[in-house]
């Protein structure tokens, strides 16, 4: 494990210098989480951009792919899964449908509803994009052992559950 100081250490040291009464441990944890999220967000955005889609668009197609054959969900199900408003979802669906990655069809069980399904082109693209995205994520973890990754995963799961 490296003892190198980083920018977050500098920030917490500055706070300690002016406010030694503060416990900056939460700042040290969340400052790093924010920086990791930003760096990984930028890296995955660039990765998915090579496939002509944004991270948000990737999330839509990936959610359909994960749903299993026939890779179909309603716009409402997609919105709920991705925590998006229906308006935000409509814009993504419009772009993805125009690109030929998905189709919207009337729901045969609900005359007022729609179903969203991945096209063959979308299926091929998402399978390549998810593999490429995992390679980006795997590369970011190269400094950790498998055991450290497992411990970190468990700690982050507990942290998330407590929020």
Where are these regions (language model features)?
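N-terminal helix-turn-helix DNA-binding core of bacterial DNA-binding proteins
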Residues: 24, 34, 38, 42-85
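Residue-level recognition of specific faces of alpha-helices
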Residues: 32, 57-63, 81, 92-95, ...
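Short amphipathic alpha-helical segments with heptad-repeat character
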Residues: 27-30, 34, 38, 83, ...
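Charged, amphipathic alpha-helical coiled-coil/dimerization segments
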Residues: 92-154
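Short, charged, intrinsically disordered terminal tails
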Residues: 161-163
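N-terminal leader segment of winged-helix/HTH proteins
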Residues: 1-51
């Amino acid at each position: 494990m490296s003892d190198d100081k980083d920018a977050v250490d500098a920030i917490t040291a500055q706070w300690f210098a002016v406010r030694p009464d503060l416990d900056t441990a939460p700042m040290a944890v969340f400052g790093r989480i924010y920086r990791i999220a930003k760096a990984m967000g930028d890296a995955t955005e660039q990765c998915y951009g090579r496939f002509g889609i944004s991270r948000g668009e990737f999330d839509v197609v990936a959610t359909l792919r994960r749903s299993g054959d026939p890779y179909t969900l309603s716009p409402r199900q997609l919105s709920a899964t991705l925590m998006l408003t229906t308006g935000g979802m409509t814009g993504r669906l419009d772009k993805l449908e125009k690109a030929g990655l998905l189709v919207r069809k009337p729901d045969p069980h609900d005359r007022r509803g729609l179903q969203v399904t991945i096209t063959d082109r979308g299926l091929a693209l998402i399978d390549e994009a998810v593999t490429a995205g995992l390679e980006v994520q795997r590369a970011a973890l190269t400094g950790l052992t498998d055991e450290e990754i497992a411990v970190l995963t468990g700690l982050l799961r507990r942290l998330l559950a407590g929020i």
